[in-house]
Amino acid sequence: MSTVQVPICAPEESGSSLLEAWFELWLEASSATLGEFARALTRGPRTPLELARWLELVAVRDKPAWSTPHRVVWEGPLARLRDFSSPQPADVVSTLVLPPQAGHDSCIVDYSTDQSQMRTILEAGLERAFALDWVGATASTAHATIEDYIAVVDRAVAHAGGRVNLVGDCQGGWLATVYAALYPERVNTLTIAGAPIDFHAGQAVIHEVLDDLTPGGSLAFYKALVASGGGVLKGEHMLRGFILINPLDEYSRQLELLRNIDDAEHVARYREFEDWFKHTQDIPGAFYLWIVEHLFRDNALISGTLEVGGRAVDLAAIDMPLALLAGASDHITPPAQVFALAEAASTQPQAVRYELASGGHLGLFMGHEALAEKWPSLLSAVAAHSQP
């Protein structure tokens, strides 16, 4: 893999100070939440056994798992490729899914038997289906670059037949878009869900936070964050960031568990989500810093100034059919960030499909509404373009 220099110790003092301030903010939010927990425990009778059960459920996590039968066809240091194809698949163009890459397990695209993007793809008649499964960063992959990830996608495309329906969720969506711009001849259709293309559009909470943490465009805070992880971005930092965006969600989820501790179905749903949400994995530091600098800060993808491997990433090179899915209440990737691709690409208007779900970010990938009402419409259009 190509390499760039990743800091392994904290940089200038300003970055360290910002990092300390970030952790202080997280501790304050955590303390406030714990205070609410303490007050909640005093409301209404709870037996010692119920409280012990609640504490156990809050504290003990299992590794999340994929739910649909499949096989791993290859594995590398950055990703493994999972094949979900039917035993005797129809003769259709293969579909390749790039899951989110934000410090969580890729199995969000196959969350459960009744909340699975992969099953929805298969049920749409796209019976040749694959998903990349991002591998958590280690010291040996801390220097992985955007070029390395494009190479991973290209390897998966080659295995799937050389030309695919590319589906990208969240961070996997901008990666799919970059790949489609670089290699349009290898992408039959492009579908993105909750994926930022214009990173500065809409009222994104992440962009507001980034403005506060990059005074004068400085990346000192983010370099300090990577340095604190020994050259990788620790997944636990990403988790804390997500919780800080809306700490009341965290508090409400734990309190609802306490209120429904005797409801077996509620407990099962809680464990399923917490096992995925709280199981974190690390991201290569070089790759993460590149994302922050070129995409979140500079917005280079939509402005046309992005380069990968010495090549310009020209969104106008994208001329294949597009399917775009956004969430009306998505504060992480507002709809304007997703739908910006239609204006930047060269795809004819009649070949662009839009869907807007009512929920937020995660619901786009595993929510009942999106999977039952939005994805089937988009995937039917993809399937129509996928016949031999």
Where do the protein language model's features map onto the residues?
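Short beta-strand/loop motif that positions the catalytic acidic residue
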Residues: 318, 324-326, 330
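Conserved alpha/beta-hydrolase "acid-adjacent" motif
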Residues: 331-337
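Alpha/beta-hydrolase-fold enzymes
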Residues: 1-37, 161-162, 177-286
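Alpha/beta-hydrolase active-site loop
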Residues: 141-159
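Catalytic histidine neighborhood in serine/cysteine hydrolases
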Residues: 345-362
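Gly/Ala-rich beta-loop-alpha elbow adjacent to hydrolase catalytic centers
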Residues: 167-176
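Short, surface-exposed "cap/lid" segments of acyl-processing enzymes
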Residues: 58-138
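Catalytic histidine-centered segment of alpha/beta-hydrolase-like enzymes
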Residues: 358-373
